[in-house]
Amino acid sequence: MAKRQLNRRQNWRIEKIQGERAARAAKRESVTLETLEGGDLGPEQTGLVIAHFGVQVEVEAQEGEDVGKVFRCHLRANLPALVTGDRVVWRAGNQGIGVIVAQLPRTTELRRPDSRGQLKPVAANVDLIVIVFAPMPEPHANLIDRYLVAAEHAGIHPLLLLNKADLIDEQNAPALNALLAVYRTLGYPVLEVSAHQGDGMQSLQSQLDGHISVFVGQSGVGKSSLVNSLLPETDTRVGPLSEVSGQGTHTTTTARLFHFPRGGDLIDSPGIREFGLGHVSRADVEAGFIEFNDLIGTCRFRDCKHDREPGCALLKGLEDGRVQQQRMNSYRSIIASLPQDSY
């Protein structure tokens, strides 16, 4: 069923109601925080944000007698927006409640624009981004390349993961093999697994051990199933594919961090169909296509748009095979989606 279109007044009313609810929640949170800070709080200690629930977060103690225990914590008003994976300084209160007093510096930050175009952090301190796709819903190189550009821009190593490999058949195998060959040629690590049958899961686990990883990819590719296979004790819900669209129904409702037995962590984040790149510049996108590195800056014209200009190094690379047509199409699509002031 198509979504009902709302007029301007209806949208204003919805935003007004949501704003009033948020204000009431913030007031209740402020009262609770004042009560906590007016009571007995423990000493400052370091912690790890493992889940975020609106105005509260779950923090795992990283030191002291409570190490490994999880506390629901309130946030002081002067703190920046916290996300799963953040390292913080906090103080424990009574009955498993605590207060976060400071955010520690992040090594990396994965961000994307929200519905209003404002940058929103998704996860912090991640050093491996696992880009998940599957035979169904049909993978699109453009979406994979958007994730790769985001990973390169954030300084996070990517791993391409084809899940549901048991669904590969004679009909879809040629296109999938051609897709994977492009990324293998570029030097990106690529794994093929089946969370359902368990094939390749040990190889995936060895890639994840010792890293702080995040799974990204459109809904329906089996991210929740992968988490359940890697960490059977979790209760991540799995949703079916829509029979109409072939896309998945969203299941995970909040980003959560899980520990692996042999070390390393996994952040399972809500499924997203489109990963926006409105926060990057044209130069950032060009840097995100690693095969462009030796070509950018060698065009005849400094302001070359790599379209039809004579002496364009990228077009020459396309002719001699150093640049694949699939990747060039993705590059042009991403550039076309950027705001004009990003040029």
UniProtKB/Swiss-Prot annotation:
GO biological process, one term: ribosomal small subunit biogenesis
Cofactor requirements of the protein: Zn(2+)
Family membership: Belongs to the TRAFAC class YlqF/YawG GTPase family. RsgA subfamily.
NCBIfam families registered for this protein in UniProt: PRK12288.1, ribosome small subunit-dependent GTPase A
Protein name per its UniProtKB record: Small ribosomal subunit biogenesis GTPase RsgA
InterPro entries referenced in this protein's UniProt entry, alphabetically: G_CP_dom, NA-bd_OB-fold, P-loop_NTPase, Ribosome_biogen_GTPase_RsgA, RsgA_GTPase_dom
UniProt keyword terms in alphabetical order: Cytoplasm, GTP-binding, Hydrolase, Metal-binding, Nucleotide-binding, Ribosome biogenesis, RNA-binding, rRNA-binding, Zinc
Subunit structure of this chain's protein: Monomer. Associates with 30S ribosomal subunit, binds 16S rRNA.
HAMAP family: GTPase_RsgA
Main location: cytoplasm
One of the record's GO cellular component terms: cytoplasm
Biological source species: Pseudomonas syringae pv. tomato (strain ATCC BAA-871 / DC3000)
Assigned EC number: 3.6.1.-
Bridged cysteine pairs (disulfide): none
